[in-house]
Amino acid sequence: MTGSLWDNPELYGLENADDPHFDLPFWQRLIERREPQRVLELASGTGRLTFPLAAAGRKRDAEFEIVGLDRSQPMLAHARAALLDQPAPVRAAVRMEEGDMRSFALEERFDLVIVPFNSLAYVHTREDQLACLRTARAHLAPGGAFAFDLLAPRFDYLAEALHPFPPMRVDADIRTPAPGVERFTRSCVDRYDPSTQTLTSTLYYDVHRSDGASERHVRDLDWHMYFPSELEGLLAAVGLEPLERSGGWNGEPLDACARRYVFVCGG
């Protein structure tokens, strides 16, 4: 069964089931430090981060609001249905909007715009990257901040991905990740095109259900592999200035060993 990963919220939930809030503490700390009243989350997906951030924000500020924007209708439908099961303060704080982060126009401004969980990597061309950054900056309130995190290129993985016959890796094996599912595995074959800095991951999702049924879903996912100097140039081109740079969610150095790029920028 093939298609887009973003058209199947169940797969997204299963692959993150072992630690669905792995990156949440960083975003909570950022909101605590900057004290925004209005937050815009781009590529918000199923609301994995949106809802807990709304809960934390409302504890601090009864007027706190967060807007989640995504272009996938299945993801938005899942998020809107899940929102109905959230506590009243979260329901009051959250609004979900459909839109493409390269070109949306909400006609409102935000104290903080965030792009979590490597989502900028799915914007592949320089033209689209600049459009996305410009659009995000245009939605910042005076004194607002723009923040994102990205996976740093793993050179051992890229070397394998350049091979004519790259290996398959099993990178997730989760037991009982959800009711009705006994086991979930994700295997991956990567191919890298250095001319475009595009890593194409062919993902094999195997779902073994409690009733004995099994199914395989195959998805191709293209990632743009960013490098720090490239990010600096893109940000400068749209008038965003990095205020904080680190190599991880806990302030790790941004060096050759960094596994992530975490930027907080002012506009």
Name every feature range the model reports, one short phrase each.
Residues M1-G45:
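Conserved class I S-adenosyl-L-methionine
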Residues T50-S103:
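Class I SAM-dependent methyltransferase SAM/SAH-binding core
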Residues A105-L112:
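A short acidic, Gly/Pro-enriched loop at the edge of an enzyme's catalytic core
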Residues P116-N118:
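Residues lining the SAM
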Residues L130-P142:
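A short glycine-rich, Lys/Arg-flanked "PGG" loop and its adjoining helix->strand segment in the class I
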Residues F148-E232:
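SAM-dependent methyltransferase
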Residues D222-G267:
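C-terminal lobe and adjacent flexible extensions of AdoMet/dcAdoMet transferase-like proteins
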